[in-house]
A protein has these predicted regions:
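Alpha-helical transmembrane bundles and membrane-interface segments of multipass inner-membrane proteins
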Residues: 1-153
Length: 153
């Protein structure tokens, strides 16, 4: 359920940004020296890796990402730990948001440019942030020992 809500939120945010702000040219400073609105299309996966050109590459990438999203969704469904389930839910929600972009636009619409002054870091979107936050929650759950006798109900 969490994944569906996050996917819808990511989808709506991406569509709003894409259709309302993408018509404006250039960047918009959101947080001076740190974060700008800077729209771009990412034809690859993370950081432009596995850049695909053409319909066959896009279809293969969509199929692989759909299978991986399904597996992570299954892990969320099986989890009895709320922190872990929330992490998996964020990962699935973000993945589905990006999958929607890739399936219907041919690429992922990234629009948040993170930088430290003149040092460029990366461009991402809300879905990417959800995936990263989910991965962080999963790592915290794995690294922080559970209290003996504690239950997660």
């Amino acid at each position: 359920m969490l994944a569906a809500g996050l996917a819808i939120g990511a989808l709506l945010l991406n569509l709003a940004i894409e259709h309302v702000l993408a018509g404006a040219r250039g960047s918009l400073v959101l947080v001076p020296g740190l974060l700008d609105y800077s729209p771009t299309w990412n034809h690859g996966v993370s950081f432009g890796l596995f850049w695909q050109n053409g319909d066959t590459g896009r279809r293969v990438l969509i199929a692989v990402l759909a299978v991986v999203s399904g597996f992570v969704g299954y892990m969320a469904w099986r989890s009895t730990n709320r922190l872990q389930a929330a992490g998996y839910g964020l990962v699935v929600g973000g993945a589905l948001g990006n999958l929607w972009d890739r399936a219907f636009s041919g690429a992922v619409f990234d629009y948040l440019f993170l930088h430290l002054g003149q040092i460029s870091l990366f461009v991402f979107n809300f879905s990417d942030a959800a995936i990263s936050a989910g991965a962080l929650l999963i790592m915290i759950d794995a690294l922080v020992p559970a209290k003996v006798g504690a239950t997660d109900s």
